[in-house]
Amino acid sequence: MHLRARAVMVAAWLACRLPEAPLLALADLAGGAWYRLATSRRRRARRNLTRVVRWLADHDMGSPEVRAAARDGRVLNHLLRDAFRHAARYYVQLVRAPIVDAKYLDRWLVIETPGVIEAALGDQRGALFVGIHMGWFELPAMVAAARTGQPALVPSETIGDPALQAYLVRTRGVLGLRLVELSSAKRLLKAALAEGGTVGLLGDRDITGGGIDTEFFGAPSPLAAGPALLAMDSGITPHVFGVWRDAAGVYHVSVEPIPFPVEGSRRERVSAYLRAEAQAFERYIAAAPEQWLAIFHPLWADLEAALAHVPVRPAPSASSAIEPAP
């Protein structure tokens, strides 16, 4: 067994047996250090977050703090540091996933749209959920598995370490999640829906390279085409969800159906669906943009091009102004 896999297993074993509060406090410290040290990651996240908060402010969306971040560099810096802390917290929760059970979900998860979720899971044709990399985004799939008694299929990138990959598959299987490799995902997901199963996808990042440019926070961004194609081929209405964490540590999940268009060419229908999906993503991200983990990754081509010509800078202080964004 590789050293990395063994280290992850030991860390997970300890994390599942220690109180959550000190672990999250440690994650906050680690996130703060990460913010200061990860120059390139911080620079990309700043550009992406700046675009998000400015768009939200222009559309009267988001909390007062989020809208203030659009014009006040100190507030933006605070929000950006929180983004690193939330990312660190997510990894802590991820290694603690084996302790998640019905009692845990009842205590730490609030379903804002229970009727919508029940209706989706009650559809005998199957259920298709599409989410974003925000909060603890695996929680809805865990809820679906607990409610239906059947595993929810979730596409996942394969890790180069076989021992670590096997560990992830095993631990997620205990939670009711069946991880499937991206190479065989299309076939397996279609088969699962045909049998009335539950499928969970994430649509805010183009991981495979086949994304379709869609207006997202005011600029074209390649969104994953998989959810749209799966909805079109299966005839099942996708249910888009968002997950965010409140100040008390409680997670909230909200779900809404996004009907797939029935008129127009195949390309027109896919494009129209993705635009409606992106608008739903924008509404969920508005609740807590600092918890949207995708800001650490390439999202918009124009911002990536700008990053290539920006010199490396040290971590900004609380009084620093917003860096310019195209």
Predicted regions and their residues:
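A generic secondary-structure micro-motif detector
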Residues: 1, 35, 107, 130, ...
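Membrane-anchoring hydrophobic helices of lipid-metabolizing enzymes
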Residues: 1-128, 167-170, 176, 319-325
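Short Gly/charged-rich anion-binding patches and loops
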Residues: 10, 44, 115, 139, ...
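Non-catalytic C-terminal accessory region of glycerolipid acyltransferases
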Residues: 34-37, 62-64, 68, 81, ...
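Active-site metal-coordination segments of metallo-dependent hydrolases
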Residues: 42-44, 158-162, 220-224
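Catalytic core of membrane glycerolipid acyltransferases/transacylases, capturing the structured
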Residues: 89, 123-183, 209-212
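Short, flexible loop segments at the rims of nucleotide/cofactor-binding pockets, characterized by
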Residues: 103-109, 174-180, 216-218, 263-264
